[in-house]
């Protein structure tokens, strides 16, 4: 009932791997040539980079921040915020999409704050370092205190 000792039956044949590599190479070549012949790129380069697997999965904190801090237009703010985004140092324009942190009220371009959360893995305000997520929603899950996990371990023994 364990793993097979001979892993050859689990391997992908070499010709399949080489074919996939060639297809990927041609896809990248066509994408690189599209701008030179006046066509838009068919790959979305704003999506997660294939060379950076750490960006493939957003942290729970980043997902929660996305849900808890809505994106609004700068002109829709009721308060009198700062004149510029302290992350990119660009002045706010009335059409800018921004996020205003609920606890401290600081305002940032939504892309600047998203990069702060995702790329830097921060859950604090870039200015005052106040946490913008409730403490109970930003703590990691503790497998040791999970009743389900404990029951599963006991049932396998």
UniProtKB/Swiss-Prot annotation:
CDD domains: RING-H2_RHA1-like
Top-level division of the source organism's lineage: Eukaryota
Pathway(s) per entry: Protein modification; protein ubiquitination
Chemical reaction(s) catalysed: S-ubiquitinyl-[E2 ubiquitin-conjugating enzyme]-L-cysteine + [acceptor protein]-L-lysine = [E2 ubiquitin-conjugating enzyme]-L-cysteine + N(6)-ubiquitinyl-[acceptor protein]-L-lysine
Record keywords, A-Z: Metal-binding, Transferase, Ubl conjugation pathway, Zinc, Zinc-finger
Transmembrane segment boundaries: none
Zinc finger (RING-type): 85-129
Coiled coil spans: none
Leader peptide range in chain numbering: none
Enzyme class: transferase
A GO molecular function held by the record: ubiquitin-protein transferase activity
The keyword Glycoprotein appears for this protein: no
One annotated GO biological process: protein ubiquitination
Enzyme Commission number(s) of this protein: 2.3.2.27
UniProt xrefs under PANTHER family: E3 UBIQUITIN-PROTEIN LIGASE RHA1A-RELATED, RING ZINC FINGER PROTEIN-RELATED
Name of the protein: E3 ubiquitin-protein ligase RHA1B
């Amino acid at each position: 009932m364990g793993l097979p000792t001979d892993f050859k039956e689990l391997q992908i044949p070499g010709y399949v791997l080489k074919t996939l590599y060639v297809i990927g190479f041609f896809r990248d070549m066509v994408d690189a040539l599209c701008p030179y012949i006046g066509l838009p790129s068919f790959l979305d380069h704003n999506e997660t980079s294939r060379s950076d697997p750490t960006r493939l999965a957003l942290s729970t904190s980043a997902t929660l921040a996305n849900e808890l801090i809505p994106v609004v237009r700068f002109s829709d703010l009721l308060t009198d915020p700062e004149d510029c985004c302290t992350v990119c140092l660009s002045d706010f324009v009335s059409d800018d999409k921004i996020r205003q942190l609920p606890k401290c009220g600081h305002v940032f371009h939504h892309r600047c704050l998203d990069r702060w959360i995702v790329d830097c893995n921060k859950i604090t305000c870039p200015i005052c370092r106040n946490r913008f997520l409730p403490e109970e929603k930003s703590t990691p899950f503790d497998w040791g205190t999970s009743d389900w996990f404990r029951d599963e371990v006991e049932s396998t023994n």
